[in-house]
Amino acid sequence: MDIAEANACAWAHGKSRLEAAIANRSNHAFETTLGGTTISRLLEGASKTHSVVMLYCGLDSPELHIARVKMRVAHGGHHISDEKIRERWDASRLNLIKLLPRLSRLQLFNNSVSVEPGRDIPDPVLVLDVESGRVNCPDQHDAAAMNAVPPWARPIVEAAIRGSRA
């Protein structure tokens, strides 16, 4: 089996496990880029029977993603094309905005800090916390907090504030 077949097989397996969890009304945790439409549609449907909680880690730019993938490949990890990374970087954030009203909770983290190999990696920074439609962080009335939101996350934070119940 070549790498493309292995990736397709792994994706199909993960999707079927998510579908089974939704059908069985059981808990399920998984990782996704949220870059396509299939998982977004499944999560939208799941929100009718489940509390969908999402921890979303984002980066400042597709170029930072590309650099991290190159580092991963250099250490034996799998490759993703630059074109695919750029497509997913935009699509993922748009899909998240569409899903916002369906999520029971969203915690959005900025994971853009880069460190030299061998150095401690700092924790991602919480940028947005929304629970039951209420924005807990950032405080939209605090100019410093709003200015601290990284540019890549601003459309998501703005959408959450527009849709906020409080």
Where are these regions (language model features)?
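Conserved nucleotide-sensing/catalytic segment adjacent to the nucleotide-binding pocket
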Residues: 1-47, 51, 83
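A broadly conserved amphipathic alpha-helix scaffold signal in soluble, globular proteins
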Residues: 44, 90, 97, 101-104
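Conserved nucleotide-binding/hydrolysis micro-motifs of P-loop NTPases
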Residues: 35, 58-64, 113-115
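A structural signal for short, well-ordered beta-strand segments and their strand-loop junctions
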Residues: 29-31, 54, 106-110
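Short, glycine/charged-enriched secondary-structure capping and boundary segments
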Residues: 43-46, 68-71, 122-123
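NTP-dependent small-molecule kinase module
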Residues: 100-166
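A glycine- and Lys/Arg-enriched "phosphate-lid" helix/loop adjacent to the NTP-binding pocket
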Residues: 50-96
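Short glycine-/polar-rich loops that comprise or flank the Walker A/P-loop
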Residues: 25, 48-53, 76, 102-105
